[in-house]
Amino acid sequence: MQVDWGEAVIYLGGQRMAVNPFCARLCFSCAPFVIAYERQNLESFLDALTRAIQFFGGVPRQVIFDNARVAVKSGFGAHAVAQEDYAQFAAHYGFEPVFCNPASGNEKGLVENLVGYIRRNVCVPLPRVRSLEELNAKLLEQCAKYQTHRVDNKPASVGEMLTEERQALHAIPRYTLDTSKKFYPTVGRYATVIVETNQYSVPCGYRGQSTTVKAYPNHIEIWLSLIHI
């Protein structure tokens, strides 16, 4: 499976804003998966991979990506060292992370073509949506529609070949890995916790207590031991 980030501009609730479509494409069937996020951060990257695996119905043997900092700790290409969270994710799902060499777009040409396809077919003219969920529903609809397409030099439609390709995918683990980014702030005197540059209010009775904050792409959860605040 090849994966990559794109960039797009939309109107969200009447306001013009930039979003980041995550694109994934299987190599045999050319089946696409696309989901948009506000940011290209680690939480979004791992959440998108989880959703792509679920959408395709199995785990590919390899995930081919570039040398973006969300995935690579050091080095590049064959010498790249994966970020700890990404390495843990790959181990959980049982795939090999493969990193492209610099300036070698041909190594993930399938997904780069998908980025362009989404830009031309979904983002022109600029989409007007009320929420990111509405945009992602449109993206999934486009992915489903593409399965009726037949790629040049392929013997069958994308959907038919995806059915065949699923037989070669690994089974999805029964346990879904928690891909949130963790923080461990103490509740301050004003009953707030600080996560990066943001403050979040909690009930006054939790002042001085240690919490676990789980940051997901579009929301956070604050936990005190096993209690979800």
Task: Outline where the language-model segments fall.
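Active-site beta-loop-alpha junctions of metal-dependent nucleic acid enzymes
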Residues: V34-Q62, Q83
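Acidic/histidine-rich, metal-coordinating catalytic segments
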Residues: V59-A78
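RNase H-like two-metal-ion nuclease catalytic core shared by retroviral integrases
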Residues: F65, F76-G77, P97-R119, L135
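Mobile-element integrase/transposase regions
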Residues: M1-P32, Q40-S44, D178-V195
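Active-site-proximal acidic segments at structured loop/helix or strand boundaries
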Residues: V115-K214
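Conserved small/polar residues in nucleotide/adenosyl-binding loops
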Residues: I227-I229
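Two-metal-ion acidic nuclease core segments, chiefly of the RNase H-like superfamily
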Residues: H79-P97
